[in-house]
Amino acid sequence: MKNEMQEFLTYLKVERRYSPETIHAYDRDIQHFFDYLTEVPIHSWNEVSVVDVRIYLGVLHRENYNRSSISRFLSSLRSFYHFLVERGVVETNPFASVSYKKGKMRLPEFFYEDEIEKFIDSIDGNQSLDQRNKALVEVLYATGMRVSELTNLTL
């Protein structure tokens, strides 16, 4: 079972060209499901039924995952099983017919212009990294990029 997991992650990296963060998220989700299956115990991807999937949803709910996280788990596992079907490892995808409503969309939190200006002005510039930090905050504000995107920038 671990072999198929590794093949899928390699497929995401090489053929789908997913980012390392996305691949890591898929890995985490599939590993969580694998850990659950070993406790049940289920010893083959082919043994998983729609009933097992529904029970797993209950487990995720009891572990206090929120709706959007559970939807992400389902999406990851649906994609993984699609891969397994395409490769002939399993005959059917038990996740294909299972749906789960996402939670309400949250509006993103944001700063007003005057709040950002106060924050940038609070970086006094007396310490060696202040200039860099000020520039980073200004780049974040001006472009709207995520912190994860900013950390991946190279000069």
Question: Can you name each region flagged by the protein language model?
Answer:
Residues 1-155:
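Conserved catalytic core of the tyrosine transesterase superfamily
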